[in-house]
């Protein structure tokens, strides 16, 4: 065994962790999480390599809301590690948080493999070495595990085997092992895209993902807390910096990792059901896809406002049935192609199924699920469970779309490869072998294949590199002599291995799977060469192993293997699967157990003879004979349902006693039974009682010590204190919890295994509830009267097994000296107990060694065995793995160890191989005997029935004799037929029963009838309906000539669709570019401009519908008037410019004196190159013209055209032959009529004058093949009779005769019937002609007298007429026959010519097909080259267009510069003219004009006219303020241009300033235009360089394409083409004779030869034509020179006339262009319009303010009125107040005299008066405030103020 970082381990070291990887129950998470030990020097040396310790589980901290949210916040890029702060300077929490620093993992950091790898668990102080068992080799392969085959390089493959990762060298077949870290299994593995790392995703509680470096195999990174129980799939992205993982049940967590930093980026729940796979999109790494049970989901990593999220979109199946998706593939454009359970491909787009892809005739793409889909080199590869690898066209799939309501699209694969029969491909990986297309395939049926997918003529056949068992290993057995082992499984195979040399030797396949296996002991077969195997159909086979090298060697024999297996004997003792096999200790008896609840015994001799069987109360799971130490030989039978039986040796009967026995059942055997009753609850109860008793004793001891201590210290006081404390404790103590209840499971726990301990005693291991213990049981005495099912027995002793409550022992075996007990556990672990010698009670069952090897979930150990010398241990698990271990020994194993295969027995090659039992429904031994007895009984019953039938037959003959005697009697003495009926009702009942039976038979046969009708219809649809016309053979009448039609099949819809699709080819990218052209952008810009114009027009239309005011109408009229004037001037200027442009173009188009037409030059060049040259396709420098280049599509179109042409010709010929057949039928009918007439005529003539009647032609069956499918009842009856006659005949000749009988008979019958019909027709047709001949004999019948002379004359005349008619009819018949034969010969001649053409067409078809195959091989590379040429051509055209655009823009800019320069000159000229000649300030004004000043750049401000005006004014002010004075030409002169000099014209000064601004504008525009021109020149230079580079690349690409075309043409030239030639067509002769070798000849077509001959005449005609044209053009040139002279004179005259008219009208010569373009002053007109608008706006505003003043006056008047009303109210209130004051004074004076009442009334009155005074005071103050408000102007008038008292009084008053 090889492991990375393998180190010596100390055997005496105590290990406290189990193999599941938990280190002392993970007590220290910081230790388990920290990849390195805490070491100060480590931190000092590598500060980057720091990790966080004490980190908790990430999934435990997640809340349920975060999981349902669908995504989690991303982690920080590194772990946070809090730094400690000294206690002297405590800092606040904020500062502590800021001191946490992100730490990154160093790229050079690695973990220690020995710290990560799980180790065996050994009990403390047991002195058991850790390397008690050492893995030597693995012979198994978990082939049904997804993605369990990966490649690290060309020779190293890795796969999972339980808790090991195996590195398999494909060349040397060596294995290296890597242990899991958790010890609970490995979930899945993955490989980095660069093959530098691989990942191992484990299983267990919160398992890790460990990433190892390759090839060092050192642990590089550990990813934690990605799932709860295990990983289902992992995948790296294309760049390899991210890793995606998905968990298994129960959480199915999808996690995206930044694996180099060991941090999860995103996490969410993938789905609620099982997820099979997750992958990144290789083209868009932010997209992922997951698939699984009944779903597919599309994910995207998207940035949201809360951060990076995983957003998933579930695929909706719609009308398609929901399916599990195993394989899928992401397409480059985002679509996804997935498989399905029924084998079709589903194309997904936008989360929906776009189309379902199937094969032609609605066949599925694969027969079964598609397990993998890949995209490789532009082709789609699908891997199916049917064992096929199919290649599909990517373009067809990518552009697929629905064409009908079914949603299906039929496509066909390009290539396909069937690996082998019974192959279930699960996955494939590309092998990185340069120059080869080899793949490594995982076969779920137990193999690793090497596939060659190159699909060429040198493609290698699929090679099976390794073969394994598929599925669970059911049994394993080891040879008693050597290092050989045998295994069997449900994959129907038995395999032999040499585990010493680590080599598989032989295998043998069967129809059923093996379930039990035992190596025959030496006492039965001394050489140890026999194996006995039990199968699931109840068959037991004895196989013999031998070394074929010891056989006699024959010539021509295949490769001799190291071992071979041969079937020796086979028998079937059971009807269900055989579960156990056991040989008696002396080897005399074989016992077999089965699930059919029987145990069968065989006597072991030369052949195994059945003894008998016994019934068991349950399915048998194990058989074991007692060892030699027991006094008697007994069989221990263990049943699954809790029964254990002990059977003695059966009695062997003699053959003569056995002959008359009806059954093999043994009924008199004394069998002991033990029915296990659950005692685990009792054991747990006893344990709890003992635990409480120990606790009670401990408390009592502590109490006694306490009392003694207090008594010694304090005496009697201490005793009292102790009693008080005890009383308090007794009060505080609560009642004890109840003991565990006794529980017995309703379903008995299954018994897994057992073994003898002593005679009558045994140990058993149970599963289910009773697991966790090993039970020692004893059989009760044998009692035949008792019922097993009512029996309940308990074990006598138990042994506790640590950590087996949920993990029971599945199988047990011992070494030779019984000191080690090897246990195979349910979770795939191996446990070894070290025992004392002679310890049947297992008292030393304490110390053990425990190690997880097989898969913990489904890797239950099915069988475990040790070698004959206890040096090796073999385990076989349900996970398909077979491990071989070296048991700890002082002796080292030799590397050259090898097992010895037994030599073959003498005469083994001559022995006949026994007939195997392959039928699973075959009778067992017991059933065969019972069947034999039943057949014997049925034979006796048949003999009795036969005797009864003879008696009935005699009675029937006697009754028939009585009937005959009755018929011989006279009628009056005869009995009536009814008198013989004993009972009339019997006959009626018989008729009723007969009718009922007929009805019943019709009902019973209704299904058969419908079945046969459907079968006939399907046969017609399959074989008859596709035929367009069958073969018809028309025979000539007089000769043996015949002509046959073509058997035509209707053209398929696929071929029609294919031709249509080929004819409608897509345009190339270059064509599309040429169609679109470079002006597309301009058109888009124009379109955009039109849109804006359209929007503006819509706005203008909206304005038109509004009512216009008078001011708007005035302004619009003024604007329209100005616009018309400007438009007129612009039109004139445009016309002048257009005329100038036309003249410029005309002068530019004038060719130079040395100009030559490029077309002429090209034609001359081609003529010089190709003159007198006829290019051959075989020439090495042959250049294929563009129109003659071919590809596969063109060839397929040509092939389709050829097929349609051939089909049309054949169809036309078939129509002609069918017409000829109809002509023959018509001729035969007419001849039949004529023959009938001839017979009628000859009946009146004398026989001497008869002419031989011509034979009527017959219609052959070949001429009417359609009548073969017409039948009637008579035909069917004949067919039935012939079938009955030929029922027992087996010869092929007889079968052919019988099958052809009904057809031939039917055709004769049909022809006879047709003949009768035609005869009747002929009689009816010739009835009129033959009436006269029929009347004469009738007259002769009545008149016997001699005829008279007249009558004789009439008879003579009639005779002459009839003789003539006879000859005429005969000639007519001959004419018809000869004419028909002539027509047939003519048509036959045409048919022969057509046959020749059809043969040539077939040859041409073969040639075209060969060319298509060749062209398809070239098509891929040619498309790549053509695409490159197209792209470069497109790029060159685009750049050329860009250059042209740049040149055009440069020309425009140069024109703009010229115009600006002309404007500047015009400006100076105009200013000079305005100054005049003798102006003394001319120099000053010119300096002002030419002065250079700095200006602020004007900003474009959008707004109305006022804002524009303000901006212009401000810019002028700023420019005048910020302008600096420059030095003039004279440095001494300094002048101020801001002040106009005295005596200088102010208008000229202002004009100078104004023109200076214009000059500056022009200069700025010139600078900008020159900059643009410079930039355009640079761009032009850059583009020119790029064009040259692109042109160079284009030329190189075209040359490469041309070279590839030549290579393709050369390969096409190598194809052999058949051309039939006649001798006169061969003109290649040597010395007057045709040479024998014609390889150097050239086949030249007549068409090409005629074309060359015609070309001579064409060139002669062209020459004469060109001479004639030359002469005409010379004459034309002379004429043009004369016209030019005349036109020059006319121009001079017209110029003089124009000059004179200008002088007469203007007084001088003026510039007409300036006159025509004279326009209005736009600035002045704009100012006028703005002024008008401003006046109108001011008037409108004045009107608005006047209306507002009137409104305010009205409001002032209303306020004044209100104020006056308030003053009147205040006056009234003052008067009232005065009155009240006076009245109050009067009441106060009369207070003492007025009232003499009680004191209480005075108090109330006083209070009321006080309240009234307060109220009035409040009212007065309120009125004062209101008066003050009313006196102010513009104050807010409030409603009258009321006091609170008034508010209370008013409702009362109301």
Swiss-Prot record:
**Entry keyword set:** Cell projection, Cilium, Coiled coil, Cytoplasm, Cytoskeleton, Flagellum, Phosphoprotein, Repeat, WD repeat
Q: Which disease is reported for it?
A: Spermatogenic failure 20: An infertility disorder caused by spermatogenesis defects and characterized by abnormally shaped spermatozoa in the semen of affected individuals. SPGF20 patients have spermatozoa with absent, short, coiled, bent, and/or irregular-caliber flagella, which impair sperm motility.
Q: Name one GO molecular function term.
A: peptidase activity
Question: What are the ranges of the WD repeats?
Answer: 226-267, 270-309, 315-358, 365-402, 468-507, 513-553, 573-612, 804-843, 856-895
Q: Where in the cell is it found?
A: Cell projection, Cilium, Flagellum; Cytoplasm, Cytoskeleton, Flagellum axoneme
One GO term (biological process)? nucleus organization
Leader sequence segment: none
Segments of skewed composition (Basic and acidic residues):
1-32, 1061-1085, 1311-1322
- Please give the family membership noted in the entry: Belongs to the CFAP44 family.
Q: Which organism is it from?
A: Homo sapiens
Gene3D superfamilies, from UniProt?
YVTN repeat-like/Quinoprotein amine dehydrogenase
**Is Coiled coil found in the keyword set?**
yes
Write out the biased-composition intervals (Acidic residues): 58-67, 714-739, 1503-1536
Report the superkingdom from the record.
Answer: Eukaryota
Coiled coil: which residue ranges? 931-958
In which tissues is this gene expressed? Testis-specific.
Q: Where is the composition biased (Polar residues)?
A: 71-88
Record flagged with keyword Signal:
no
- Protein name, UniProt field: Cilia- and flagella-associated protein 44
Which residues are reported to carry the modification Phosphoserine?
1083
């Amino acid at each position: 065994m090889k492991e990375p970082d393998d180190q010596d381990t100390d055997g005496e070291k105590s290990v406290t962790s189990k193999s599941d990887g938990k280190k002392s129950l993970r007590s220290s998470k910081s230790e388990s999480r920290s990849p390195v030990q805490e070491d100060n020097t480590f931190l000092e040396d590598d500060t980057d390599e720091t990790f966080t310790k004490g980190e908790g589980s990430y999934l435990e901290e997640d809340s349920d809301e975060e999981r349902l949210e669908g995504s989690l916040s991303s982690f920080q890029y590194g772990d946070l590690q809090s730094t400690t702060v000294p206690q002297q300077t405590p800092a606040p929490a904020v500062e502590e948080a800021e001191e946490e620093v992100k730490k990154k993992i160093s790229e050079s950091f690695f973990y220690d493999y020995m710290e990560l790898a799980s180790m065996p668990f050994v009990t403390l102080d047991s002195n058991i070495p850790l390397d008690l068992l050492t893995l030597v080799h693995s012979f198994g392969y978990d082939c049904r595990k997804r993605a369990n085959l990966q490649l690290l390089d060309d020779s190293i493959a890795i796969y999972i085997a339980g808790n090991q990762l195996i590195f398999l060298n494909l060349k040397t077949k060596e294995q290296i092992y890597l242990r899991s870290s958790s010890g609970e299994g490995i979930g899945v593995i993955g490989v980095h895209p660069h093959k530098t790392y691989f990942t191992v995703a484990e299983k267990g509680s919160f398992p890790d993902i460990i990433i190892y470096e390759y090839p060092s195999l050192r642990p590089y990174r550990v990813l934690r807390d990605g799932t709860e129980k295990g990983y289902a799939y992992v995948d790296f992205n294309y760049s390899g910096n991210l890793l995606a993982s998905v968990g298994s049940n129960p959480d199915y967590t999808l996690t995206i990792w930044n694996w180099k930093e060991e941090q999860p980026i995103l996490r969410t729940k993938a789905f609620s059901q099982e997820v099979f796979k997750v992958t990144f999109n290789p083209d868009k790494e932010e997209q992922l896809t997951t698939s699984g049970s009944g779903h597919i989901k599309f994910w995207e990593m998207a940035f949201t406002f809360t951060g990076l999220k995983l957003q998933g979109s579930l695929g909706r199946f719609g009308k398609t049935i929901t399916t599990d998706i195993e394989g899928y593939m992401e397409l480059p454009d985002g679509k996804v192609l997935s498989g399905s359970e029924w084998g079709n491909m589903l194309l997904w787009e936008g989360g929906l199924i776009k189309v379902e892809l199937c094969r032609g005739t609605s066949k599925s793409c694969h027969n079964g699920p598609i397990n993998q889909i890949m995209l490789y080199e532009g082709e789609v590869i699908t891997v199916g469970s049917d064992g096929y690898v199919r290649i599909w066209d990517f373009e067809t799939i990518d552009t697929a779309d629905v064409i009908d309501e079914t949603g299906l699209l039929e496509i066909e694969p390009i290539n396909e490869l069937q690996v082998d029969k019974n192959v279930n491909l699960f996955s494939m990986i590309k092998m990185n072998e340069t120059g080869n297309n080899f793949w490594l395939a995982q076969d779920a049926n137990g193999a690793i294949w090497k596939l060659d997918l190159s699909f060429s003529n040198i493609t290698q056949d699929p090679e099976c590199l390794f073969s394994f068992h598929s599925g669970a290993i059911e049994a394993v057995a080891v040879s008693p002599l050597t290092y050989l082992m045998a295994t069997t499984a449900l994959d129907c195979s038995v395999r032999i291995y040499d585990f010493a040399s680590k080599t598989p030797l032989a295998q043998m396949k069967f129809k059923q799977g093996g379930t039990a296996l035992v190596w025959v002991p030496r006492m039965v077969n001394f050489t140890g060469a026999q194996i006995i195997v039990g199968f699931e159909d109840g068959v037991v086979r004895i196989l013999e192993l031998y070394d074929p090298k010891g056989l006699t060697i024959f010539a021509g024999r295949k490769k001799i293997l190291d071992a071979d297996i041969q079937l020796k004997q086979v028998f079937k003792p059971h009807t269900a699967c055989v579960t156990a096999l056991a040989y008696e200790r002396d080897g005399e008896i074989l016992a077999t157990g089965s699930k059919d609840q029987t145990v069968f015994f065989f006597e072991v001799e030369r052949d195994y003879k059945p003894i008998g069987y016994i019934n068991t109360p349950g399915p048998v799971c194990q058989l074991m004979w007692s060892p030699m130490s027991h006094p008697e030989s007994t069989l221990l039978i263990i049943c699954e349902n809790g029964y254990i039986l002990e059977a003695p040796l059966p009695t062997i009967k003699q053959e003569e006693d056995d002959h008359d026995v009806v059954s093999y059942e043994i009924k008199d055997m004394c069998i002991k039974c033990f029915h296990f009753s659950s005692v685990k609850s009792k054991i747990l109860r006893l344990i709890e009682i003992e635990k409480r008793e120990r606790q009670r004793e401990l408390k009592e001891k502590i109490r006694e010590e306490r009392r003694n201590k207090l008594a010694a210290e304090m005496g009697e006081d201490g005793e009292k204190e102790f009693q008080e404390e005890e009383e308090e404790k007794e009060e505080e103590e609560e009642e004890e919890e109840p003991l565990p209840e006794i529980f017995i499971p309703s379903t008995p726990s299954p018994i897994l295994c057992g073994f003898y301990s002593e005679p009558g005693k045994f140990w058993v291991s149970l599963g289910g509830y009773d697991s966790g213990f090993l039970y020692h049981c004893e059989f009760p005495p044998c009692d035949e009267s008792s019922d097993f099912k009512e029996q309940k027995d308990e074990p006598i002793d138990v042994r506790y097994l640590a950590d087996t409550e949920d993990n029971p022992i599945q199988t047990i075996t011992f070494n030779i000296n019984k000191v080690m007990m090897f246990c195979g556990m349910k979770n795939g672990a191996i446990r070894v107990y070290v025992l004392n010698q002679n310890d049947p009670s297992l008292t030393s069952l304490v110390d053990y060694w425990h190690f997880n090897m097989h898969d913990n979930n489904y890797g239950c150990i099915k069988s475990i065995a040790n070698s004959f010398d206890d040096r090796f241990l073999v385990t076989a698990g349900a996970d398909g793995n077979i491990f071989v271990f070296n048991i700890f020994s002082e002796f080292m194993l030799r590397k050259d160890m090898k097992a010895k295969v037994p030599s073959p027995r003498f005469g083994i090659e001559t022995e006949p191989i026994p007939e195997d039992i392959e039928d699973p429904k075959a009778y067992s031994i017991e059933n065969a005997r019972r069947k034999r007895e039943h057949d014997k009984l049925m034979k006796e019953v048949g003999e009795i029935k036969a005797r009864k039938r003879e008696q009935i037959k005699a009675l029937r003959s006697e009754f028939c004799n009585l009937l005959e005697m009755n018929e011989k009697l006279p009628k009056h003495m005869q009995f009536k037929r009814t008198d013989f009926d004993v009972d009339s009702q019997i006959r009626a009942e018989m008729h009723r029963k007969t009718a009922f039976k007929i009805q019943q038979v019709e009902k019973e046969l209704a299904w058969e009838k419908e079945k046969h009708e459907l079968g006939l219809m399907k046969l017609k649809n399959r074989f008859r309906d596709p035929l367009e016309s069958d073969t018809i053979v028309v025979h000539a009448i007089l000769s043996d000539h015949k002509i046959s039609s073509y058997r035509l099949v209707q053209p398929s819809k696929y071929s029609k669709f294919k031709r249509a699709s080929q004819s409608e080819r897509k345009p190339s990218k270059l064509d599309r570019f040429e169609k679109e052209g470079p002006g597309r952008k301009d058109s888009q810009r124009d379109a955009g401009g039109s849109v804006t114009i359209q929007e503006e027009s819509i706005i203008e239309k909206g304005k038109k519908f509004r009512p216009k005011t008078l001011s708007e109408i005035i302004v619009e009229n003024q604007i329209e008037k100005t616009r018309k004037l400007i438009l007129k001037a612009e039109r004139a200027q445009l016309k002048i410019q257009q005329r100038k442009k036309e003249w410029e173009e005309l002068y530019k188009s004038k060719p130079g004196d040395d100009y030559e037409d490029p077309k002429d030059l090209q034609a001359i060049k081609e003529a010089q190159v190709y003159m007198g040259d006829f290019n051959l396709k075989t020439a090495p420098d042959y250049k294929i013209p563009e129109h003659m280049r071919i590809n596969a599509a063109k060839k397929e179109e040509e092939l389709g055209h050829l097929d349609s042409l051939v089909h049309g010709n054949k169809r036309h010929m078939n129509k002609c032959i069918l017409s000829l057949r109809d002509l023959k039928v018509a001729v035969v009918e007419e001849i039949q009529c004529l023959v009938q007439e001839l017979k009628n005529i000859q009946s009146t003539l004398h026989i001497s004058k008869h002419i031989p009647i011509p034979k009527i032609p017959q219609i052959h069956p070949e001429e009417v093949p359609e009548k073969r499918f017409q039948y009637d009842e008579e035909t069917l009856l004949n067919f039935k009779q012939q079938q009955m006659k030929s029922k027992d005949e087996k010869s092929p000749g007889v079968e052919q005769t019988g099958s052809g009988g009904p057809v031939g008979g039917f055709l004769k019958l049909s022809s006879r019937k047709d003949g009768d019909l035609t005869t009747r027709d002929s009689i009816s047709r010739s009835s009129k002609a033959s009436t006269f001949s029929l009347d004469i004999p009738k007259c002769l019948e009545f008149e016997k007298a001699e005829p008279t002379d007249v009558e004789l004359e009439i008879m003579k005349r009639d005779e002459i007429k009839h003789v003539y008619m006879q000859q005429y009819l005969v000639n007519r018949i001959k004419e018809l026959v000869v004419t028909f034969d002539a027509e047939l010969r003519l048509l036959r001649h045409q048919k022969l010519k057509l046959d020749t053409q059809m043969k040539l067409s077939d040859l041409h078809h073969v040639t075209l097909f060969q060319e298509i195959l060749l062209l398809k091989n070239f098509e891929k590379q040619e498309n790549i080259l053509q695409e490159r040429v197209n792209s470069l051509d497109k790029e060159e055209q685009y750049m050329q267009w860009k250059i042209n655009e740049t040149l055009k823009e440069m020309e425009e800019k140069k024109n703009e510069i010229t115009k600006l320069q002309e404007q500047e000159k015009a400006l100076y000229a105009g200013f000079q003219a305005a100054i005049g000649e003798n102006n003394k300030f001319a120099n000053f004004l010119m300096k002002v004009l030419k002065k250079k000043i700095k200006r602020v750049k004007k900003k474009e401000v959008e707004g109305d006219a006022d804002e524009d005006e303000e901006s212009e004014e401000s810019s002028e002010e700023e420019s005048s303020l910020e302008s600096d004075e420059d030095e003039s030409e004279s440095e001494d002169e300094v002048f101020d241009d801001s002040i106009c000099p005295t005596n200088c014209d102010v208008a000229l000064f202002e004009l100078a300033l104004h023109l200076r601004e214009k000059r500056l504008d022009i200069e700025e525009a010139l600078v900008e235009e020159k900059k643009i021109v410079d930039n355009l020149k640079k761009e032009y230079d850059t583009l020119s360089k790029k064009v040259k580079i692109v042109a160079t690349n284009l030329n190189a690409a075209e040359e490469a394409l041309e070279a590839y075309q030549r290579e393709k043409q050369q390969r096409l030239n190598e194809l052999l083409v058949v051309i039939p030639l006649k001798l006169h067509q061969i003109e290649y002769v040597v010395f007057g004779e045709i040479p024998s070798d014609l390889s150097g000849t050239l086949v030249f077509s007549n068409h090409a030869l005629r074309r060359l001959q015609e070309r001579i005449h064409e060139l002669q005609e062209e020459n004469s034509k060109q001479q004639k044209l030359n002469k005409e053009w010379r004459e034309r040139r002379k004429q043009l020179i004369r016209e030019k002279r005349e036109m020059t004179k006319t121009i001079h005259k017209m110029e003089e006339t124009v000059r004179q008219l200008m002088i007469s009208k203007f007084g001088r010569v003026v510039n007409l262009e300036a006159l025509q373009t004279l326009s209005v002053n736009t600035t002045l007109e704009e100012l006028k319009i703005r002024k008008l608008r401003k006046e109108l706006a001011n008037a409108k505003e004045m009107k608005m303010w006047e209306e507002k003043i009137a409104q305010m006056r009205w409001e002032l008047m209303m306020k004044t009125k209100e104020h006056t009303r308030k003053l009147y109210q205040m006056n009234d209130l003052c008067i009232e107040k005065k009155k009240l004051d006076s009245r109050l004074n009067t009441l106060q004076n009369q207070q003492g005299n007025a009232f003499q009442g009680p004191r209480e009334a005075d108090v109330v009155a006083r209070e009321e008066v006080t309240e009234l005074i307060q109220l009035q005071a409040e009212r007065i103050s309120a009125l004062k405030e209101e008066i003050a408000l009313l006196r102010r102007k513009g104050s807010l008038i409030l409603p009258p103020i009321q006091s609170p008292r008034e508010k209370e009084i008013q409702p009362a008053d109301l």
